[in-house]
Amino acid sequence: MDIKACYQNAKALLEGHFLLSSGFHSNYYLQSAKVLEDPKLAEQLAKELAKQIQEAHLNIECVCSPAIGGILAGYELARALGVRFIFTERVDNTMALRRGFEVKKNEKILVCEDIITTGKSAMECAKVLEEKGAQIVAFGALANRGICKRVHSHLKAQEGACLPSHLPLFALEDFVFDMHKPSSCPLCTTSTAIKPGSRGN
C-alpha cells in the first residue's frame, strides 16, 4: 500500500510554513484527518498497521490515543486488533483520562497517534496510563516524521525523539521533511508559521 500516495490523493500533504505540535517549524504538514475522513481507507490503513503489530506477537489488550488527532487512527486500529479503545485529552493543558474511562492494573496498552513527530504527546498519554497502573507495550501511528525510530525502517532515532528506545514504534511510512527550531527557522525570514490544527487549536 502506497501511504504517501494516500496522503497526496487526499490532499493531506500540505506545503507552506507550519508550526508543528512538537514546536518545530516545517515546510510540510501532514493532515491525517483528510485521509481518515474516508472510512474505507481508514479501515485499510488500520488493518495494514495491525498486521505489523500482530506479526510482532505482542499481547495488546487496549489501544489509547491522545485527543484529538489520534482518535480516528486509534479507534480504527483497535477495531482491526479486536480490542477496546480509550483516549486521553487535555484539561487545562494537562493530559488526563476522563469520560469514565478506566484502565486495569498491568493492562497492556498500545498508544496510537495519527502522526508521530517527536512522540511528546504520545508520551504524555503513556504517562497518564502508567500512573493508573497500565503497562505500555508499544506505540503506533499511521506516519512517522523520521525523528523516532520505527520497526521496519533503516532510520535511526534523531535528537528530540521522546519515545523510549526499549519499546517498539509501528508506523506505515516515514515522511522525512526538513524541520527547524523556531530560533533558527529559515522560513521565518519571509513568512510566519501557521498552526493548521493540533494543540491549542
From Swiss-Prot:
Q: Which residues bind 5-phospho-alpha-D-ribose 1-diphosphate?
A: E113, D114, I115, I116, T117, T118, G119, K120, S121
Q: Per the UniProt record, which EC number(s) apply here?
A: 2.4.2.10
Q: Which domain of life is it from?
A: Bacteria
Q: Iron-sulfur: is it a keyword of this entry?
A: no
Query: Which molecular function term from Gene Ontology is one that the record holds?
Result: orotate phosphoribosyltransferase activity
Q: Which family does it belong to?
A: Belongs to the purine/pyrimidine phosphoribosyltransferase family. PyrE subfamily.
The alphabetized list of GO BP terms reads: 'de novo' UMP biosynthetic process; pyrimidine nucleobase biosynthetic process
Which UniProt keyword terms apply here? Glycosyltransferase, Magnesium, Pyrimidine biosynthesis, Transferase
Q: Which reaction does this enzyme catalyse, per its entry? A: orotidine 5'-phosphate + diphosphate = orotate + 5-phospho-alpha-D-ribose 1-diphosphate
The record describes the protein's role as: Catalyzes the transfer of a ribosyl phosphate group from 5-phosphoribose 1-diphosphate to orotate, leading to the formation of orotidine monophosphate (OMP).
Pathway(s) this gene product operates in, as recorded in its UniProt entry: Pyrimidine metabolism; UMP biosynthesis via de novo pathway; UMP from orotate: step 1/2
Q: Which residues form the signal peptide?
A: none
Which PANTHER family does UniProt cross-reference here? OROTATE PHOSPHORIBOSYLTRANSFERASE, URIDINE 5'-MONOPHOSPHATE SYNTHASE
Q: Which cofactor does it need?
A: Mg(2+)
Q: Name one Pfam family in it.
A: Pribosyltran
Which HAMAP family does UniProt cross-reference here? PyrE
In Swiss-Prot or TrEMBL terms, this protein is called Orotate phosphoribosyltransferase
Record bears the keyword Magnesium: yes
Q: How does the annotation summarize its subunit structure?
A: Homodimer.
The residues listed in the UniProt record as binding orotate, with positions renumbered to this chain, are T117, R145
